[in-house]
Amino acid sequence: MRLIVYNIRYATGTGPTFHLPVPGSGYLRSSPRALHGIAEFIRGQDPDIVGLVEVDTGSIRSGMINQAEFIAHSIGHYSIHECKYGVRSFNQRIPVLRKQSNAFLSAPRVHGERFHYFTTGIKRLIIELELSEVCVFLVHLSLKYRQRQEQLRFMHDLIQKSSKPVVVAGDFNTFWGTDEIYLFMRATGLRSANAQGLPSYPARVPRAELDFVLVDPRIRVEHFAIPDVRWSDHRPLVCDFSVIPGGSP
């Protein structure tokens, strides 16, 4: 099974013009070229599952285009998506922010999906995608260290409830890489598919390991790569894995 995890930064593109006329102004405009480039890259990888972080699901910024559905249609998948903020968050009332989402794209072999929410942080959404043999969770953790640790504790309790092998993936915002999630991995038994600790951010010259695919002991990682793709400020993660028959590592 092939999983792609990609923080696409709302398909706003990259480069020096992103910060013109003022720093960060690029967040207010999307790039059709970037969106088509992201879709073309994903289609070329022929994934079974795609976890997208920072997706615009139809605000004025994206020209009212639901980026999750656009990419899903281009690869023949279906999409599930939800606003990344808490259900009662004030951000749910702000036109552009309420369309800032995370999404799963998947082939039809899905048994169900669930939305969970962290109790701390601004970005609270957890998407759980249940397949026949595995459960995959998509997260975007807080920029604040203490809140990230509280969110990881919440994730620990959540994945303990799963009877199936688990994958936890997404943008962890871990500025110290795997060192920051060492105790979480020890407590859950998960390990990083990125055995070499390759960085994924920033896309142009990666220095930080912010994005992760963490896998259950009952899962075999067959291939892992971080392609040199620069449609976003993050590079994508590509992970091929299989569930070990009988459930023993």
Please provide the spans of the model-predicted regions.
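Beta-strand-turn-beta hairpins that frame and shape the catalytic cleft
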Residues: 1-4, 12, 106-111, 122-138, ...
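N-terminal, active-site-proximal structural segment of metallo-dependent hydrolase catalytic domains
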Residues: 1-74, 81-89, 245-249
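Active-site metal-binding loops of divalent metal-dependent hydrolases
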Residues: 7-8, 55, 141, 171-172, ...
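Short aromatic-enriched loop/helix-cap "lid" or pocket-rim segments at secondary-structure transitions
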Residues: 13-19, 64-65, 91-94, 126, ...
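Short, flexible loop segments at the rims of nucleotide/cofactor-binding pockets, characterized by
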Residues: 25-31, 116-117, 142-146
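Soluble or luminal CAZymes and related metallo-dependent hydrolases
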Residues: 29-37, 63, 121, 147-154, ...
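Structured beta-strand-rich core segments of catalytic domains in phosphoester-bond hydrolases
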Residues: 54-133, 225-228
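Metal-dependent phosphoester-hydrolase catalytic domains
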Residues: 110, 115-117, 130, 147-150, ...
